[in-house]
A protein has these predicted regions:
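Long, low-complexity intrinsically disordered regions
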Residues: 1-276, 280-282, 288-368
Length: 368
């Protein structure tokens, strides 16, 4: 069977279109969060930055209001990392990845758990969290008093991997970098607490927001395994393509796949964003030479999309009334690209530092 081959650049434009990065969307915040299958939210400000680059008219206050009124919530889901989900989605996503989270705890923390009983620790942790919200550090310290042979971190993470713990305000909202307060989802979101999401629905939703994609891409995003079973079950609903490296790619027939030469605007990303973390093959979002030059998981700066790919990193600093944005390119930029980065960078810096008096944007010269 001969399949149409899609280049990395074609895949890039398809991803940008679905991720609302070709043009800002007029979707509401909760609808955008749901469509994207949640936003990576390791740092307090990450979801705000990710949504500002995707939605027209986005404001800090609008997302904070949804966090406070419990329409969206931040908890550990895909890949064992923090994500911001809608209240309707959180339980379903968490239920699907629960086996992975429990296995991750066992692989990383069982040796640090001493001779303690997991069920007893879990029961004691639930009692503590039902009394009042706690930071992870305080939870581990409190449990250590009763379970002395375990390291505090192994105790608190056991609760985070076995219970859906939500990070609640006033922590983890814009500008608040303090240690997050945790509570059980049952103490924060309204019932029902059984909101099943099927693996087949997960595949459909992934393809809508990230396709065309391979089975390896899907599994990298969520850390579920054997999704080939669900893909086979959807065979009649999907179309197939082939990637440059010979992988079979799956997609929804009516999903957008723009031309490879579709113009792509400059966009600023948070430090962690599923637009590149949600794939096994990240060459749709980074040039080969840049992938070899930078380490996505060590000393990596938040990314800047230039002509659709992550082509630079950014740093924002503040000294009294002066806000400064410094952009470090990963390869040589054209003069036109520099002007585009400066223009979008000025708007981005004003979003990041609303109360500054002076704004400075500098695009550094590329240095090999």
């Amino acid at each position: 069977m001969t399949r149409e081959m899609l280049s990395n650049r074609q895949l890039n434009r398809a991803t940008l279109a679905r991720q609302m990065l070709l043009e800002r969307s007029d979707l509401g915040i909760a609808d955008a969060v749901a469509f994207l299958g949640g936003l990576q939210a390791q740092q307090s400000n990450d979801p705000y930055i990710g949504l500002w680059s995707r939605l027209g008219g986005f404001s800090h206050e609008a997302l904070t209001a949804l966090i406070v009124d419990r329409s969206v919530a931040r908890a550990t889901t895909m890949r064992g990392t923090l994500h911001l989900h809608t209240a309707d989605d959180l339980i379903g996503f968490r239920g699907l990845v629960a086996p992975f989270l429990k296995a991750a705890w066992k692989n990383n923390f069982l040796k640090r758990f001493g001779s303690e009983d997991q069920k007893a620790v879990h029961k004691a942790g639930v009692r503590l969290l039902n009394k009042s919200p706690m930071t992870s550090g305080a939870l581990g310290k409190a449990l250590k008093e009763k379970f002395p042979t375990a390291e505090p971190l192994s105790l608190s993470v056991l609760l985070q991997m076995s219970e859906t713990l939500v990070q609640i305000p006033p922590t983890r909202i814009w500008g608040n970098g303090s240690a997050p307060l945790l509570t059980r989802v049952e103490n924060w979101l309204p019932p029902p607490y059984e909101r099943p999401l099927s693996r087949i629905d997960l595949v459909r939703r992934y393809l809508a927001a990230y396709g065309p994609a391979s089975i390896q891409d899907m599994q990298t995003w969520c850390r579920l395994t054997k999704l080939s079973v669900e893909v086979k079950g959807l065979e009649k609903e999907l179309v197939n393509f082939e990637s440059e490296d010979g992988r079979v790619l799956y997609d929804l027939p009516e999903a957008p796949r723009p031309d490879a030469d579709t113009p792509a605007p400059v966009r600023f990303l948070p430090l962690y964003d599923n637009v590149y973390l949600g794939y096994d093959n990240r060459r749709r979002m980074l040039m080969d030479a840049d992938l070899k030059r930078i380490n996505l998981f060590a000393d990596f700066k938040p990314g800047v999309l230039i002509d659709g790919v992550i082509a630079a990193g950014w740093v924002v600093s503040r000294k009294k009334g002066v806000a400064r944005l410094e952009v470090e390119p990963y390869h040589k930029l054209t003069k036109k690209q520099v002007r585009e980065v400066e223009a979008e960078g000025d708007a981005f810096l004003r979003f990041m530092e609303e109360d500054a008096e002076t704004y400075e944007v500098e695009v550094l010269a590329f240095s090999k």
